[in-house]
Amino acid sequence: MAIDSKPHDDLQLFKTNLHPCGYWPDRWASDLVMDPNDPRLGAIYPQTLAWGFRRSGNLLYRPHCEHCNACVPVRVNVNAFVPNRSQRRCLARNATLVTRIVPAERNAEQLSLYRRYLHQRHPDGGMDGHGAIEFDQFLIGPWGYGRFMEIREPATNGTPGQLLAVAVTDLTHQALSAVYTFYEPNAAARGLGTLAILHQIHWAQREQRPYLYLGYWIKDHFKMDYKRRFQKLEIYDGYRWRPFSTTYPTTHTL
């Protein structure tokens, strides 16, 4: 992985101990983590997205596994994006829903949806016991970039409609980053995860941000392969961003 760190030559990266892979049950993983005590993290966070890093709470990390390079950083070139037929159907199916951007501040309604989502969609995944403290630690960043994009049923008699999804999104001066999305598990047929990304792309276009970072694409993984459907997609090969291809190798060069 190449990092253009000339303005930050003293950046410190730490490699974590091995831990069970969150994607493949028979593999072990490790990550590179930027020094969480570095006071510059908030300022350089937008640039770290272009280096393939992700945010989890106040930690900036990227996978760095000795014998596996399956996690490939991807981003959508929003100005070149064209929705496919399935995505157009998703937009039409959900045309009556209401989307709004709110501050990244937890409320009881959001927390209830988050806990329901984890309990039904990720049981025994290590997160299904999350409460208010874990919600804040995981989703709300300390640097002021975070926003919550809420997707709701239409209002009735002035009362907001049911909260169906929350897309935690970081808005930087260079791009948007899709941090985490959770939604009503009983409304999965609506394709709310896809809808959230489509609205994030529109949001980036509206804010004149050229990219939406989607985290890591994992080829043929049932939870992560969907990201390739949002074209024009770009991948980070460890040195530079390239047009998406399922055949590009990745590296972990420092």
Curated annotation (Swiss-Prot):
InterPro entries: Acyl_CoA_acyltransferase, Asp_Glu_LeuTrfase, N-end_Aminoacyl_Trfase, N-end_Aminoacyl_Trfase_C, N-end_Aminoacyl_Trfase_N. Coiled coil: none annotated. Keywords: Acyltransferase, Cytoplasm, Transferase. One of its GO terms (molecular function) is arginyl-tRNA--protein transferase activity. It catalyses: N-terminal L-glutamyl-[protein] + L-leucyl-tRNA(Leu) = N-terminal L-leucyl-L-glutamyl-[protein] + tRNA(Leu) + H(+); N-terminal L-aspartyl-[protein] + L-leucyl-tRNA(Leu) = N-terminal L-leucyl-L-aspartyl-[protein] + tRNA(Leu) + H(+). SUPFAM superfamilies: Acyl-CoA N-acyltransferases (Nat). It is an enzyme of class 2 (transferase). Its EC number is 2.3.2.29. GO terms for biological process: ubiquitin-dependent protein catabolic process via the N-end rule pathway. One of its GO terms (cellular component) is cytoplasm. It comes from the Bacteria. It is found in: Cytoplasm. Functions in the N-end rule pathway of protein degradation where it conjugates Leu from its aminoacyl-tRNA to the N-termini of proteins containing an N-terminal aspartate or glutamate. Belongs to the R-transferase family. Bpt subfamily. This is Aspartate/glutamate leucyltransferase. It comes from Xylella fastidiosa (strain Temecula1 / ATCC 700964). The lineage of its organism: Bacteria, Pseudomonadati, Pseudomonadota, Gammaproteobacteria, Lysobacterales.
